[in-house]
Amino acid sequence: MKKTIFNSVAFGIIALAILGCKKETEAPQSTTGTATVEGYIKYNRNLRNDTLPDGSYALIREGIPTSVTLTFTLDSYDLDKNPDPSYNYDIIQKVVTVDASGHYSVTLPTPNSSNTIYGELLISDFEYNPIITSSQNTDSLAARVVVSGPSLPFSIYKGGKTILDHNF
């Protein structure tokens, strides 16, 4: 009887030790991928430099001021594999600036599938004094100009690169 109880207890301890061990689980896969949006935002600041030496016209644009912000907006509803219409999803916003040449680049989240999602780029307002030709044929500054940035739609997909340029 003692042997039977001892064997049962020993068997129970061994079974518990084997079944109680947990396998190390792998880290869960990311639920989102990424995509890159990049491009140039430019404007025509120097209205005098549009005439070439031979008298022909060529519009020459420059990068917008580096203080201008670019706000990229996505709806996180689009990132969910099985979105719940009754859930209030967050709006994702990423803000970047341009370099001196007007170039920007931003990495945004995408669904972890090949689905394309849509977003919006908003360029903040900025002001400048355009360079014009005076009556003495020299550079002079015109009155202040305020530029209001439009809202630009874009599309992205996992692993993709979207080029989005804009000229004022």
Over which residues does each language-model region extend?
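Short Pro-Gly-centered beta-turn/loop motif in secreted/extracellular proteins
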Residues: 105-119
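Glycine-centered loop-to-beta-strand initiation motif
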Residues: 39, 97-109
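Short, ordered, surface-exposed loop/turn motifs in non-cytosolic proteins
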Residues: 46-89
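Structured interaction patches on ligand/partner-binding surfaces of diverse proteins
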Residues: 125-162
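Short beta-strand and strand-turn-strand segments in soluble, beta-rich domains
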Residues: 82-93, 144-148
